[in-house]
Amino acid sequence: MQLFPLCLIISCSCPTVQASKLCLGWLWGMDIDPYKEFGASVELLSFLPSDFFPSIRDLLDTASALYREALESPEHCSPHHTALRQAILCWGELMNLATWVGSNLEDPASRELVVSYVNVNMGLKIRQLLWFHISCLTFGRETVLEYLVSFGVWIRTPPAYRPPNAPILSTLPETTVVRRRGRSPRRRTPSPRRRRSQSPRRRRSQSRESQC
């Protein structure tokens, strides 16, 4: 099993510093949180159960359907697009590693153990990353952060004192208790009544008085 960390370091040589740090952080226990720069944290994501996140195949299909042109573009679109590129590349290299291990390890038990570790543990991290950045691009980062906070409060509240259903991301802006900071929409106030101009009859009487 000592071969696995070495292979992971080699396979995770993604073309960006952030992706390399991310892979090394998983191995050597560095305090590197890939969500910090986006206002979230690994701990905040951990409130969501593992079965909450779609499969990697579904997430990759979603990313391809919605953002393929931007992901393949040589231009910098947003930090979320960059993070998505890194996560997709890293998962591809992990799959190459799992294939290599499956072909070269003679011990079936060790081979199954390594492949299972990649699919379960590393797979969950990639699923979390993909879900977070796809959701931020789809719903907006502030909405996703509000959802994570709302879900964390809901899951930690005893069942007797919380709503029966967990918050839903797509309906969060309409129902969340955590309000986004910003100016409240202006209310339209009725404009003051304009003073009526003097009627022609009144103006005529005044003109007659001035002539007298």
UniProtKB/Swiss-Prot annotation:
Coiled coil: none annotated. The keyword S-adenosyl-L-methionine does not apply. The record marks 183-184 as: Cleavage. Sequence repeats lie at residues 184-190, 191-198, 199-206. The keyword Kinase does not apply. Homodimerizes. May regulate immune response to the intracellular capsid in acting as a T-cell tolerogen, by having an immunoregulatory effect which prevents destruction of infected cells by cytotoxic T-cells. This immune regulation may predispose to chronicity during perinatal infections and prevent severe liver injury during adult infections. Belongs to the orthohepadnavirus precore antigen family. This is External core antigen. It comes from Hepatitis B virus genotype C subtype ayr (isolate Human/Japan/Okamoto/-).
